[in-house]
Each structure stands twice: as structure tokens, then as C-alpha cells.
Amino acid sequence: MSDRRRLIALCLALCFSFICASPASTKDAERYRAVPANADGIGKAYMDRQIAHVMSFQGAAWLERNEREREERSDLLLGILSLASGSSVADVGAGTGYYARRFADLVGPTGTVYAVDVQPEMVAVLQAAAKRRGYEHIKPVLGTVRDITLPAGSVDVAIMVDVYHELEFPYEVLQSVVHSLKPGGRVVFVEYRAEDPRVPIKRLHKMSEAQIRLEAEQHALEWERTANELPWQHVVIFKRK
């Protein structure tokens, strides 16, 4: 092949790759940036916050540890949430279903708890636990790293307990959460307080209220209130506009 033909072929290949470039990959480049990775972070930042490593299904036992109730005071969280009987709740990043089961007790058999996770192994664990305990109104859902895969307008309240800071695509996931909300539905972030140095959690696994609000307000969400009654976490609540 002559040099001229090689040049033409190269130009055509470049043009083709440009035309066929994924809109998602273009948006990713605009929305996220690479940063030095470390033991706790994935080397990717969103709004100047490095995203933390996700907890593997191999750490499932830690989610069911005996100390969790004392450390997190789930009883106080449930009081803050005040989930109504018959409500439809999305537990995003449900893990083993530790909170999904508690939400299910509040909404009762006429309600629904969508227990969403991206790890098939974790979904299998929570499904087995729900079946063993007789929670027929807990519906395990396998989501993706970009989408919780719930129907539009199907959820009254979406709750993320120590989850949002680990999302590989936080913008896209939160957009799908908002899409799933009924009019006036709520999104609840429960995160370890980055403002408090006494909270014994690694830095990338904590979030400040200001950072949560900054990221949430990129969507059709309006801050409603923040509750600080929990020992280590804050509960930041938004309402769909």
C-alpha cells in the first residue's frame, strides 16, 4: 500500500471511530476525571471526590455483624424515615438485606421493598435470607453500575445506606433513582460524617453534608432536611421536584 493510501485509510479510521464514539463514554470523560488510586479509592473522581472501592460480597458477614445495631442505631434511622404502611421503598445497594428487612417490617405486607444490588452473589444472599424469614414483599433486583433498573414512578422512598460514596457512576445511578420516584418521592442518603474526625471510618468512605447536597442538586432534587441523631452518620433527605 502506498503512503498516500495508508494516510487515507488512517484518516477514514479516525473519522469512523469519532463518529461511532459512545455518547456515554463522551459524557464520562466530561463528568469524571482520573486521580491517583489508593487502597481505598478507585482512581476516579466525581465533583472533586474520589470514589471509594465497593464492598465485595465476600464481606457480607460484616454487614450482619452483631455490633451494627449499636454502632448505627438502626432504630433511630427507622424513626427518622417514618416509612408508611403500604409504601414502596427502594433499598439501593441493599447488600445482604440488613436494612431491607427492617424497611419491610415498617411498610408491611401491603408495601414493597425493592432490594437493589449490582453483585449477583449479594442478590442471592439477600434473596435467600428474605425467603428464609418469610419476607414475600422484599423483591430482590439486580441493577447495573449505571442504573437501578426500576420502573419510572414506582417508588415512594429510595434509601442508600453507606452506599452512594462507592457508586462507580454516581451521576447515572442517582438519575435512575430520581426516574424511579413517584411525584414528590424522596431520596435518602445515609453516610458517615466526614465533618467529624471522631468517626472511625476511612476518609473515602465518609461524605460531608455539603458534598452530598452538591451532588444531589445536580438532579431534580430539593433538599428537605438533615438529621444528625445517629452516632456516626447523617441522614440527608431530598424531595423530587
List each model region and its residues.
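Hydrophobic beta-strand segment of the Class I
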Residues: V89, A158-I159
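A short acidic, Gly/Pro-enriched loop at the edge of an enzyme's catalytic core
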Residues: R146-V157
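Class I SAM-dependent transferase core
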Residues: K27-A90
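Core SAM-dependent methyltransferase catalytic element
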Residues: W223-K241
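Conserved SAM/SAH-binding beta-strand->alpha-helix loop
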Residues: Q119-P120
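Conserved class I S-adenosyl-L-methionine
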Residues: R186-R213
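Conserved SAM-binding strand-loop segment of SAM-dependent methyltransferases
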Residues: R133-R146
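A short glycine-rich, Lys/Arg-flanked "PGG" loop and its adjoining helix->strand segment in the class I
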Residues: A104-D105, Y171-R186
